[in-house]
Amino acid sequence: MFTGIVEEVGTIKSINRGQHSAVLTVRAKTVLEETRIGDSIAVNGICLTVRQLFPDSFAADVMHETLNRSALAQLTVGSAVNLERAMPVNGRFGGHIVAGHVDGVGRIANIRKDDTAIWYTIHADPAILRYVVEKGSITIDGISLTVAAVEPTGFSVSTIPHTVRQTNLHQRHKGDFVNLETDVVGKYIEKLLHPEAPKQNTLTKEMLLRCGF
């Protein structure tokens, strides 16, 4: 589990694509401290498992499905990525519950500045927007942010300059794709209020007779 509080911005050192997966090597410093092989690190909001450790970087496997369903497919060598280690039991809970399992991809439709904040408008699929509520939490590229406004085609967040400086937001531009993870609490509430219909049992007396029982 993560909290959406980015620990540092790393850079993509290499991307090695195979037939069914890829290996990302990420240059980092802070998140390497006390990290072991098998630990989880969120890379732009996606939970990845460390497979190799180097003095200045770590490597992780990425399945093609993850690449296809996320904005990781847009990364190139040198791309800046937000990094966060999994939250320790005795750690501070500074953001909100982040699973590291993105729901989909959004696109930056607009960026504007006012006296005290930078506003990002994100366009997203209706399947994602159903879980986005005003004043609720959302994770954008691994950053825990508060939704300021919701529109039919997207939503807006207001960020303070400190957040922009400490993440890769300062390198984002209009048209860029970003990973989105909605608040898991909303998903559980929907599941409880609208449970799936029970599956019909296909093991019947007639079927057993046909099979010779």
Residue ranges, per PLM feature:
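Conserved loop->alpha-helix
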Residues: 1-213
